[in-house]
């Protein structure tokens, strides 16, 4: 491992497993990040953009109807209200400011559900940076509203036709582009995964989610929640929620992986509980692998959770037992999607619906239990309405 300023590992997970040509690029990024973190002017500009462009702080909303007949209080951290429609905007603004600080003149990114792509596109438009987004052709098809949004904001969207035509293939293409153009290009990675220092940078630019939640819940309830719950694909919204609660040992941290069509079918995206540790996407972390070590196809109804690995800090939190990682099926997520829309007037992203489904499962399993739960509603479901409409019609539920 080359010299780094910050620890590149979380326990045994993480690291910087990249072609030698990219090591100095990552070291430059780490140095710029450490300097920016200690620069009041950078922090002031970042905070100003979060407040006056993105719309922070986001609300913490008490569910009025979902918990009727139970003794649970359920709050939603409303990242769906952020400009761009999801938590992704937070760290995108931070990374583009970093890229400008390093003198980069071009941004590339990968996207699955399109939320990271939209966040990157809107921030690049506002901060005047050319932008290219790689997206699996399967995701281009199922997330057409977000593709249109990106193109409308001047971003070049490149459909990736290789492999499973999904997020992991978009990540590989973005990495290839970066390897060829690193001198003028910043790869704006969209989740808390990948080679060091990305997991740390993304966490630091997302941790205001948990910081705000802690302040807001103390103000509203006078105590900390019993559990905070977030969906986990790569893991950025969850680590953003968890970070400020890690040392609060009475607060359960629950990250929800996608069980897809059922763990037993093999069609899922739950590497933490059903994968094996290996090297993938520049890091050491749990991966869905075949017996001979090939990367297995992940699957989820939610494009943003359709990823065969997971961020290294989540792997570490799982290994030491600090966080729990249950999984939720497509059907359970769809049911939660419908319930929130019907009873609270909020349409969640399918990603967030997994976290909500876990909360509902906890509530329904013990309605008499007094508990205070917070779900990170990481994004809104506008992008998913066509997918859900098609599924519900096929099931005869509409």
UniProtKB/Swiss-Prot annotation:
Transmembrane found in the keyword field: no
Keywords, comma-separated and alphabetical: Amino-acid biosynthesis, Aromatic amino acid biosynthesis, Lyase, Pyridoxal phosphate, Tryptophan biosynthesis
Pathway info: Amino-acid biosynthesis; L-tryptophan biosynthesis; L-tryptophan from chorismate: step 5/5
Keyword Amino-acid biosynthesis carried by entry: yes
EC number: 4.2.1.20
Residues in the signal sequence: none
Modified-residue entries (N6-(pyridoxal phosphate)lysine), positions: 88
Cofactor: pyridoxal 5'-phosphate
MF terms (GO), sorted A to Z: tryptophan synthase activity
Reaction(s) the record says it catalyses: (1S,2R)-1-C-(indol-3-yl)glycerol 3-phosphate + L-serine = D-glyceraldehyde 3-phosphate + L-tryptophan + H2O
One Gene Ontology cellular component annotation held by this UniProt entry: cytoplasm
Pfam family, one: PALP
Function: The beta subunit is responsible for the synthesis of L-tryptophan from indole and L-serine.
Record family assignment: Belongs to the TrpB family.
Complex formation: Tetramer of two alpha and two beta chains.
Identification of the protein by name: Tryptophan synthase beta chain
Organism lineage: Bacteria, Pseudomonadati, Pseudomonadota, Gammaproteobacteria, Pasteurellales
């Amino acid at each position: 491992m080359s010299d780094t300023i910050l620890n590149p590992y979380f326990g045994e997970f993480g690291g910087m497993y990249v072609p030698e040509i990219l090591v100095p690029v990552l070291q430059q990024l780490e140095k710029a990040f450490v300097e920016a973190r200690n620069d009041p002017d950078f922090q002031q500009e970042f905070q100003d953009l979060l407040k006056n462009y993105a719309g922070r702080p986001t609300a913490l909303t008490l569910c009025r109807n979902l918990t009727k007949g139970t003794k649970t209080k359920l709050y939603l951290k409303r990242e769906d209200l952020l400009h761009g429609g999801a938590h992704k905007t937070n760290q995108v603004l931070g990374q583009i400011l970093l890229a400008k600080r390093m003198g980069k003149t071009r941004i590339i990114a990968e996207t699955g559900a399109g939320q990271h792509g939209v966040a990157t596109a809107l921030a690049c438009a506002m901060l005047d940076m050319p932008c290219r987004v790689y997206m699996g052709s399967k995701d281009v098809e199922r997330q057409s509203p977000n593709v249109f949004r990106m193109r409308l904001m001047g971003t070049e969207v490149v459909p990736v036709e290789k492999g499973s035509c999904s997020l992991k293939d978009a990540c590989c293409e973005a990495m290839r582009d970066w390897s060829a153009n690193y001198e003028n290009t910043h790869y704006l990675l969209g989740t808390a995964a990948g080679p060091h220092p990305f997991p740390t940078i993304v966490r630091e630019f997302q941790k205001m989610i948990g910081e705000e939640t802690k302040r807001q819940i103390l103000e509203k309830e006078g105590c900390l929640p019993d559990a905070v719950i977030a969906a986990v694909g790569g893991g950025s919204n969850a680590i953003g929620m968890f970070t400020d609660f890690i040392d609060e040992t009475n607060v359960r941290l629950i990250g929800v992986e996608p069980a897809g069509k059922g763990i037993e079918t093999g069609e899922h995206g739950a590497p933490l509980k059903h994968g094996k540790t290996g090297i993938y996407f520049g890091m050491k972390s749990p991966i869905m692998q075949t017996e001979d070590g090939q990367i297995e196809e992940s699957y989820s109804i939610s494009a943003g959770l359709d990823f065969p690995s997971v961020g290294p800090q989540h792997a570490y939190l799982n290994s030491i037992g600090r966080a729990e990682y249950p999984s939720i099926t497509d059907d359970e997520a769809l049911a939660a999607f419908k319930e929130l829309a019907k009873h609270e007037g909020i349409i969640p992203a399918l990603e967030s619906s997994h976290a909500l489904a876990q909360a509902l499962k906890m509530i329904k399993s013990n309605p008499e239990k007094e508990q205070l739960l917070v779900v990170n509603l990481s994004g809104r479901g506008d992008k998913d309405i066509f997918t859900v409409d098609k599924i519900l019609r096929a099931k005869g539920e509409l």
